[in-house]
């Protein structure tokens, strides 16, 4: 073969065994190599190294590209090349001619002393030259996975070996954290980071289907895996306790009965405001099965419909509550200012609101009757609501010329307005329940939306001022016979028939000629205008005086609720007529008005400013508190509305998908993610405030003035009336400047505390429920020392210390206990169940956090008590005999057994108020240690024996401080509830529970305060008197006594673990008592707002830009870099990438 042919084929042969000049390599890359080079040039540089192979001694040399597999095979000789068919005929002939050539007999062998840098052995065959060393072909392997990398490798500095080591492509990209978590291949271009993993864009899919998440799609995480909306909703999403829909975004977590319940935010607000769940238990069991049977589009449509329904319910009813509550507030404010005429205009607007609600209830009732379903129980509540409003009109007519500062009149007004809010709330709940029952039981989908649309008509009611010209009711309604039946002349307070201005009972319809009467139907009745009589259809047509061409007037049906509205209008017109006749009401000056009221209400025209008199008017105080609350919430609402656009643009959250959702809490919580972006060179910033999230702000319970706020403010006003001195220097709980921890005033000299100079207007009010365990122990100790001088005739100091569990046992007492069994004291203690279990165990095992009562701290009470009181608050507590009657004894036994087995097994809403009250008494009666404890029974009885009322109050107050924390928190919640129940004792002459504070104390005392001994001395009357004082002044007894509170404010008390002896505490207490007077102090009832737990909506962005430089950039920088950017975390965790210089590995033969 000629030299020319050899160059042509890229082959070089030698006959003397000495290798000539190495052949020139002519690389011919394959198509696959071309594609790889093109892709890597654009996205990521990597070295593609070629190998030069030299034949063994006496053979031919071949220079071409080698793969890692080919490098393991021996080079072919001439015969093998000829037989392989790779050469054409000319090349085969050339090989034959070369075979005929004569080789020298003596062949010169070259000895080699090359050493492999990896194994240290002598290289006698093929070898690789790379990284400045030579290796056996089989020894040149990846440092991480030990695979052959002679064909292509990536050098990297190894800090442990202090030299460069070769890596394969996979391990190199693994060290750079640039491997796809799905396919395991290198990431050379755009990628997505999610769940702390990286994915190719086309590989970021659902774990159960092939849904690819685009830049603006949402994904859901569960147990480290990614799911689409459909599979997460049907398989793993937590269910809402209200609607049983999947929880995919924000939610509220409620800990109840030892179980954590998850709620949608609007579902929880609907349940909290009206105690209504949107889904029944029967449908909850099959909801997941139904969801799995739906397609993705059907599931999306169903969820969208559910979301719209929930929002429609909340929006319509919450706004209706706000309108009605504001109207009630305006009405009472006008009455307090003496603006009686304007108050009538305000009442006219309130009647229109009621008319809208009654119209919606009638529409639901009509649909229920078409399905022959059970009617809604709305009659009693609607009747009591109208009676209270009529009573307000009667009271205004009675006292419009008299002094309205009379305490009895003030209390009557407060009770009536409390009843208005209470019964209006019940009617909203009843109507909502009826609409949901039609939808779920009878598949009537249009009933509830129709009712909500009717309620939304309240926004069209005139919202302007209360000018006297706005009164548009006909004055002829003031006639004496306008509210009577036309036939029987009796009161018409039920459904009736109407023809023009004639109204009569359906049962009173009777033909004056033939005496026909049908009490079930009224279609036959006609009105004869000539005779002014009611006739049947036959008598009416047979009459010669009636022309056939004339229309035949027939009666129309008037529902019961429509008749109630008609009666309210009559009462209002009569009041308006009285006020017009006595023109004094429109000219009299308003009672002393606070100038601050001018800017309080935007809907009420305040009276002219007058000087504030020294004597405080009760209505003016109430109006200040109520309108401060309205102003606070309305300003918050206006601020949120005006800043909605700004917040939607500024409240942005930028992060990559790699950001972990650590705020979401538990693994079972839904992790909802969204990533967005476009192929630009920068990170994408996506707004986190989507329309749904902005709409979530509407579910803030503190943004609107509701019917629940009215009883709270009225309760505060009553407390102010009973104890004005306690509230003289205390701000209202609606004052934003009010804080729990206001500092006490100390007189210091050279850093040493000389004494305390308390000021009544600045002294903080502490509550027993807010104290820490150390402060409670200190309070008990000091209370015993203060209590001893007051009861020294009855108990010694040691006996008081033993009552409060503060006395440490002596030697003989401990010696005697050593002989007792370990379970001697606890052998009869029941630990499982609900009834008969000690209160401390119930609180520790399944407590409910309650904010009812005074103070801002959370009170830990048994879950049963929390559920029972919450259910009773939503009931009608004006039922006669509540807490006095024993209820159904058999049902009580069934309920107690069910609660012992499973606390969640009963539905409190299905029980009557009397049954729930009896169940609560049974629970208290069966406590092993009563609520007020056996040990302190004597102190409570002793307090009732003291002659001085001031001493009785002090002894009771200090005795309360000695109660265990669980007993005291439970007592505070129960007594606060009983105080509220007593407000329903007398609503009017016919309605009321007749259970005032004394009657409640009489029936509850045998269950909470009794002696352990069988002493024949009957002390039940003394116990009742003690409990009566506790209920009547429960807010005062929830405070820390003033002298103890000042001690707790001492900064040196707990400084450096200061240890006080009893004598030091007693001496310190005497110093404080000598400096201050013990006047009565109290605080307004303050209810802490319930915080809503939000699940953070994770907003992430996809970095779709290629962070990998091109090949030319690598040539300039001689480095490889791959960075991941996280806009949400400025301090990125990106690690420095190793410097890589492209090199060629040369494979030779030794």
Swiss-Prot record:
<feature type="domain" description="LIM zinc-binding 3">
    <location>
        <begin position="483"/>
        <end position="546"/>
    </location>
</feature>
<dbReference type="InterPro" id="IPR000198">
    <property type="entry name" value="RhoGAP_dom"/>
</dbReference>
<dbReference type="GO" id="GO:0051285">
    <property type="term" value="C:cell cortex of cell tip"/>
</dbReference>
<dbReference type="Pfam" id="PF00412">
    <property type="entry name" value="LIM"/>
</dbReference>
<dbReference type="GO" id="GO:0051286">
    <property type="term" value="C:cell tip"/>
</dbReference>
<dbReference type="GO" id="GO:0007165">
    <property type="term" value="P:signal transduction"/>
</dbReference>
<dbReference type="GO" id="GO:0005829">
    <property type="term" value="C:cytosol"/>
</dbReference>
<dbReference type="InterPro" id="IPR001781">
    <property type="entry name" value="Znf_LIM"/>
</dbReference>
<keyword id="KW-0440">LIM domain</keyword>
<keyword id="KW-0597">Phosphoprotein</keyword>
<dbReference type="GO" id="GO:0032153">
    <property type="term" value="C:cell division site"/>
</dbReference>
<feature type="domain" description="LIM zinc-binding 1">
    <location>
        <begin position="114"/>
        <end position="177"/>
    </location>
</feature>
<keyword id="KW-0862">Zinc</keyword>
<dbReference type="InterPro" id="IPR008936">
    <property type="entry name" value="Rho_GTPase_activation_prot"/>
</dbReference>
<feature type="compositionally biased region" description="Polar residues">
    <location>
        <begin position="1104"/>
        <end position="1134"/>
    </location>
</feature>
<feature type="compositionally biased region" description="Low complexity">
    <location>
        <begin position="642"/>
        <end position="655"/>
    </location>
</feature>
<keyword id="KW-0343">GTPase activation</keyword>
<feature type="region of interest" description="Disordered">
    <location>
        <begin position="1104"/>
        <end position="1150"/>
    </location>
</feature>
<dbReference type="GO" id="GO:0046872">
    <property type="term" value="F:metal ion binding"/>
</dbReference>
<dbReference type="GO" id="GO:1903338">
    <property type="term" value="P:regulation of cell wall organization or biogenesis"/>
</dbReference>
<feature type="region of interest" description="Disordered">
    <location>
        <begin position="726"/>
        <end position="759"/>
    </location>
</feature>
<dbReference type="GO" id="GO:0005737">
    <property type="term" value="C:cytoplasm"/>
</dbReference>
<dbReference type="GO" id="GO:0030036">
    <property type="term" value="P:actin cytoskeleton organization"/>
</dbReference>
<feature type="compositionally biased region" description="Basic and acidic residues">
    <location>
        <begin position="1"/>
        <end position="10"/>
    </location>
</feature>
<feature type="domain" description="LIM zinc-binding 2">
    <location>
        <begin position="178"/>
        <end position="238"/>
    </location>
</feature>
<dbReference type="Pfam" id="PF00620">
    <property type="entry name" value="RhoGAP"/>
</dbReference>
<dbReference type="GO" id="GO:0005096">
    <property type="term" value="F:GTPase activator activity"/>
</dbReference>
<dbReference type="GO" id="GO:0005634">
    <property type="term" value="C:nucleus"/>
</dbReference>
<keyword id="KW-0677">Repeat</keyword>
<feature type="region of interest" description="Disordered">
    <location>
        <begin position="586"/>
        <end position="683"/>
    </location>
</feature>
<dbReference type="GO" id="GO:0032956">
    <property type="term" value="P:regulation of actin cytoskeleton organization"/>
</dbReference>
<keyword id="KW-0479">Metal-binding</keyword>
<feature type="region of interest" description="Disordered">
    <location>
        <begin position="1078"/>
        <end position="1097"/>
    </location>
</feature>
<comment type="function">
    <text>GTPase-activating protein for Rho1. Involved in the F-actin patch localization, cell morphogenesis, regulation of septation, and cell wall synthesis.</text>
</comment>
<feature type="compositionally biased region" description="Polar residues">
    <location>
        <begin position="598"/>
        <end position="617"/>
    </location>
</feature>
<feature type="compositionally biased region" description="Basic residues">
    <location>
        <begin position="1088"/>
        <end position="1097"/>
    </location>
</feature>
<feature type="compositionally biased region" description="Polar residues">
    <location>
        <begin position="40"/>
        <end position="62"/>
    </location>
</feature>
<feature type="modified residue" description="Phosphoserine">
    <location>
        <position position="690"/>
    </location>
</feature>
<protein>
    <recommendedName>
        <fullName>Rho-type GTPase-activating protein 1</fullName>
    </recommendedName>
</protein>
<feature type="region of interest" description="Disordered">
    <location>
        <begin position="1"/>
        <end position="78"/>
    </location>
</feature>
<dbReference type="GO" id="GO:0000935">
    <property type="term" value="C:division septum"/>
</dbReference>
<keyword id="KW-0539">Nucleus</keyword>
């Amino acid at each position: 073969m000629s030299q020319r042919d050899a160059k042509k084929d890229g082959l070089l042969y030698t006959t003397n065994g000495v290798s000539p000049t190495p052949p020139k390599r002519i690389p011919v890359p394959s198509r696959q190599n071309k594609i790889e080079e093109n892709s890597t040039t654009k996205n990521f540089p990597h070295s593609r190294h070629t190998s030069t192979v030299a034949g063994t001694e006496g053979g031919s040399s071949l220079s071409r590209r080698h793969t890692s597999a080919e490098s393991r095979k021996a080079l072919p000789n001439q015969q093998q090349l000829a037989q392989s068919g790779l050469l054409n005929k000319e090349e085969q002939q050339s090989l034959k001619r070369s075979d005929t050539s004569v080789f020298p007999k003596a062949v010169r062998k070259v000895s080699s002393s090359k050493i492999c840098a990896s194994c240290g052995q002598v290289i006698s065959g093929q070898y690789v030259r790379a990284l400045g060393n030579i290796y056996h072909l089989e020894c040149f392997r990846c440092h991480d996975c030990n695979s052959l990398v002679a064909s292509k490798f990536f050098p990297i500095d190894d800090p442990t070996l202090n030299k460069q080591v070769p890596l394969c492509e996979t391990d190199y990209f693994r060290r750079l954290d640039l491997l796809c978590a799905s396919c395991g291949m290198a990431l050379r271009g755009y990628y997505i980071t999610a769940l702390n993993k990286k994915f190719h864009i086309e590989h970021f899919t659902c774990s159960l289907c092939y849904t690819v998440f685009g830049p603006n799609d949402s994904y859901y995480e569960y147990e480290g895996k990614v799911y689409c909306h459909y599979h997460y909703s049907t398989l793993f999403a937590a269910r809402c306790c209200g609607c049983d829909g999947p929880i995919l975004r924000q939610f509220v977590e409620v800990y109840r009965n030892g179980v954590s319940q998850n709620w949608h935010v609007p579902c929880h607000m609907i349940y909290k405001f009206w105690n209504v769940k949107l889904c029944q238990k029967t449908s909850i069991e099959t909801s997941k099965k139904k969801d799995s049977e739906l397609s993705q589009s059907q599931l999306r449509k169903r969820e969208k419909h559910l979301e719209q329904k929930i929002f429609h319910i909340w929006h319509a009813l919450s706004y209706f509550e706000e309108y009605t509550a504001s109207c009630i507030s305006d009405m009472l404010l006008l009455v307090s200012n003496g603006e009686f005429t304007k108050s009538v205009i305000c009442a006219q607007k309130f009647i229109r609101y009621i008319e809208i609600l009654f119209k919606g209830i009638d529409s639901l009732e009509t649909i229920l009757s078409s399905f022959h379903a059970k009617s809604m129980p709305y009659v009693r509540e609607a009747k009591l609501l109208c009676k209270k409003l009529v009573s307000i009109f009667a009271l205004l007519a009675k006292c419009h010329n008299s002094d309205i500062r009379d305490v009895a009149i003030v209390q009557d007004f407060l009770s009536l307005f409390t009843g208005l809010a209470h019964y209006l709330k019940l009617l909203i709940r009843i109507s909502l329940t009826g609409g949901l029952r039609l939808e779920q039981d009878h598949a009537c989908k249009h009933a509830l939306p129709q009712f909500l649309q009717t309620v939304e008509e309240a926004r069209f009611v005139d919202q302007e001022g209360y000018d006297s010209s706005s009164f548009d009711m006909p004055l002829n309604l003031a006639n004496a016979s306008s509210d009577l039946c036309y036939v029987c002349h009796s009161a018409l307070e039920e459904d009736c028939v109407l023809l023009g201005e004639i109204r009569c009972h359906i049962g009173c319809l009777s033909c004056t000629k033939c005496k026909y009467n049908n009490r079930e139907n009224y279609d036959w009745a006609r009105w004869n205008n000539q005779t002014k009589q009611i006739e049947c259809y036959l008598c009416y047509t047979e009459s010669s005086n009636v022309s056939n061409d004339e229309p035949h007037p027939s009666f129309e049906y008037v529902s019961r609720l429509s008749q109630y509205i008609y009666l309210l209008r009559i009462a209002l017109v009569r009041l308006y007529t009285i006020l017009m006749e006595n023109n004094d009401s429109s000219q009299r000056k308003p009672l002393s008005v606070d100038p601050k009221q001018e800017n309080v209400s935007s809907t009420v025209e305040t009276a002219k400013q007058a000087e504030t008199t020294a004597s405080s008017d009760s209505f003016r105080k109430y109006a200040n508190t109520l309108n401060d609350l309205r102003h606070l919430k309305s300003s918050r609402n206006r601020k949120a509305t005006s800043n909605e656009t700004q917040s939607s643009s500024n409240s942005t959250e930028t992060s990559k998908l790699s950001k972990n959702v650590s705020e979401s809490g538990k693994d079972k919580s839904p992790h909802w993610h969204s990533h967005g972006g476009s192929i630009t060179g920068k990170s994408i910033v996506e707004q986190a405030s989507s329309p749904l999230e902005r709409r979530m702000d509407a579910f803030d319970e503190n943004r609107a003035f509701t019917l629940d706020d009215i009883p709270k403010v009225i309760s505060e006003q009553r407390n102010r009336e009973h104890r004005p001195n306690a509230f003289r220097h205390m701000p209202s709980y609606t004052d934003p400047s009010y804080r729990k921890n206001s500092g006490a005033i100390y007189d210091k000299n050279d850093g040493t505390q000389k004494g305390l100079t308390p000021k009544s207007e600045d002294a903080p009010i502490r509550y027993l429920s807010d104290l820490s365990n150390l402060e409670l122990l200190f309070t008990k100790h000091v209370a015993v020392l203060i209590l001893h001088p007051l009861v020294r005739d009855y108990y010694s100091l040691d006996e008081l210390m033993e009552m409060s569990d503060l006395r440490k046992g002596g030697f003989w007492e401990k010696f005697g206990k050593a002989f007792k069994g370990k379970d001697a004291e606890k052998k009869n203690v029941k630990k499982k169940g609900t009834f008969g279990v000690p209160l401390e165990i119930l609180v520790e095992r399944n407590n409910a956090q309650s904010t009812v009562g005074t103070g801002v701290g959370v009170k830990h009470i048994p879950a049963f008590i929390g559920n029972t009181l919450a259910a009773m608050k939503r009931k009608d507590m004006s039922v006669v005999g509540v807490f006095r009657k024993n209820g159904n004894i058999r049902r009580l036994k069934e309920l107690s057994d069910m609660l012992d087995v499973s606390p969640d097994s009963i539905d409190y809403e299905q029980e009557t108020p009397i049954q729930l009250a009896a169940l609560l008494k049974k629970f208290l009666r069966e406590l092993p240690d009563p609520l007020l404890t056996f040990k302190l029974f004597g102190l409570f009885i002793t307090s009732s024996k003291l002659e001085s009322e001031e001493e009785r109050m002090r002894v009771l107050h200090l005795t309360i401080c000695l109660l265990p924390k669980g007993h005291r928190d439970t007592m505070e919640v129960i007594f606060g509830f009983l105080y509220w129940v007593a407000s329903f004792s007398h609503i009017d002459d016919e309605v009321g529970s007749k259970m005032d504070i004394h009657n409640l104390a009489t029936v509850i005392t045998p269950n909470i305060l009794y002696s352990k001994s069988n002493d024949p001395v009957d002390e039940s009357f003394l116990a009742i008197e003690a409990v009566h004082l506790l209920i009547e002044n429960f807010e005062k007894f929830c405070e820390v006594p003033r002298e103890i509170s000042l001690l707790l404010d001492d900064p040196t008390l707990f400084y450096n673990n200061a240890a006080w002896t009893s004598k030091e505490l007693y001496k310190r207490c005497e110093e404080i008592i000598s400096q201050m007077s013990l006047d009565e102090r109290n605080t307004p009832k303050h209810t802490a707002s319930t915080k809503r737990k939000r699940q953070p909506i994770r907003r992430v962005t996809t970095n779709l830009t290629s962070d990998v430089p091109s090949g030319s950039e690598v040539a300039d920088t001689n480095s490889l870099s791959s960075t991941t950017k996280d806009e949400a975390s400025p301090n990125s965790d990106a690690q420095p990438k190793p410097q890589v210089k492209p090199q060629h590995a040369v494979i030779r033969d030794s």
